Amino acid sequence: MTPADLRQSPPLPPGGPTARTVLQLQGVGKRFPGVVALDGIDLDLRAGEVHAVCGENGAGKSTLMKIISGQYRADDGVVLYDGAPVQFSSATDAQAAGIAIIHQELNLVPHLSVAENIYLAREPKRGPFVDYRALNRAAQLCLQRIGLNVSPTTLVGALSIAQQQMVEIAKALSLDARVLIMDEPTSSLTESETVQLFRIIKELRSEGVAILYISHRLDEMAEIVDRVTVLRDGRHIATSDFASTSVNEIVARMVGRPLDDAYPPRRSTPTDQVLLKVRDLQRTGTFGPVSFELRKGEILGFAGLMGAGRTEVARAIFGAERPDAGSILLGDTPVEINSPREAIRHGIAYLSEDRKKDGLALAMPVAANITLANVAAISSRGFLRFADETAIAERYVRELGIRTPTVAQIARNLSGGNQQKIVISKWLYRGSRILFFDEPTRGIDVGAKYAIYGLMDRLAADGVGVGVVLISSELPELLGMTDRIAVFHEGRITAVLETGKTNQEEILHHASGRSHA
């Protein structure tokens, strides 16, 4: 059956227990060198349903969606689309059949307009030229369908992340997608933007679109998900109705054991020794003045709404942005930090919220990434001592539980949780004493989150003089892992709260600026 044949299939009925199966995987397997990514996966997706796929990083979710969307070919098993076996040769082939995917890392061209992105490589033509009037008219219809109030002529680069995601959905609708794969669609959205996305998902479901929904945010699934499938180590563990399955059951299936607590017991206790003092730091139009202290053995949280200035303050202390005024003291010693290189020399590390862009050399091996910030320590006369590099990397792989076949594995091939551990290893090997973790658990699964939390606590508790700043948009994460929480609003700290004596409501009160009303 060709993509053209598939596009001519009849409209799909609304979802439900008797809805027709649109897509079915039978015994699907996929292998890579040294890794079995999928092992005999069975899965069915029905018209008009939202079917969640959950699993730890490395469970096989990404490989699964790439097989369905034509980016990979299965080594074993069969994929059935409308009951007929298919083997898409490319993502374009799958799109032609009505299968669209919205990646977590959006696939848009910033310098092109909204309309040009929606119909990229499919623009209506008038003779040899693009018919921009027809293009913008068609794009406007797609935008109206999802309720996105932007002009089709607006450059995509000028849109917010949430608006760009809506453009991706509009693009999928322009393909007449009957199967829509969504990969971590809410990871970069605010609460109100998530509400808007869920409204669109519900409308698509009512129109008979089959949606495969991949997410780590189990708590938000109840509103939209009909069924949930759990993968672990490339195998199908269970499929069940979401309404009759508790979050704890899903987590237990994901990690292979009951997970009684979301956060490990804290071992670290702050001392009276101040590692970092920030006094009246400011950058005109961005933040400030900001003042706070970080103590040895402490995990200090930065809370606040998007754009409140938390990341900008951390980047200024790390030397990635230049403040206009204020001072930074290590202990009682003033320091001037004009670049990340100087910050690193002073023992300050910053783990970016975008680890793939700023934290890793994705095309390099695990070993090279771990030693990247301290290459001089394993070099002699300008030559790298590869045996030392390997030994050091293997030590951190063991200590941090990094799942990789060897330290020669390319970093790009590892899961998000393991990539995050590599970034942490890099700074530990450098001997950093002040660590800024910026959204460290974004896009990683519940088991990997627990491991990252344990690492942060271990760093603060090990008695080597480390202090940790945790920047997070997840209030339960801040309440579960920190000693104190500095709350930001419009570039200023509006309160510093003792974690054990506060709650989400008080944090939100200060984050919204109501404490200054």
From Swiss-Prot:
Keywords: ATP-binding, Cell inner membrane, Cell membrane, Membrane, Nucleotide-binding, Repeat, Sugar transport, Translocase, Transport
Cellular localization per UniProt: Cell inner membrane
Statement: the UniProt record of this protein carries the keyword Protease: no
Keyword Nucleus: no
Catalysis performed (reactions): D-ribose(out) + ATP + H2O = D-ribose(in) + ADP + phosphate + H(+); D-galactose(out) + ATP + H2O = D-galactose(in) + ADP + phosphate + H(+)
GO molecular function: ABC-type D-ribose transporter activity; ATP binding; ATP hydrolysis activity
Role noted for this protein: Part of an ABC transporter complex involved in carbohydrate import. Could be involved in ribose, galactose and/or methyl galactoside import. Responsible for energy coupling to the transport system.
Species whose genome carries this gene: Burkholderia ambifaria (strain ATCC BAA-244 / DSM 16087 / CCUG 44356 / LMG 19182 / AMMD)
Name of the featured protein: Putative ribose/galactose/methyl galactoside import ATP-binding protein 1
Main location: membrane
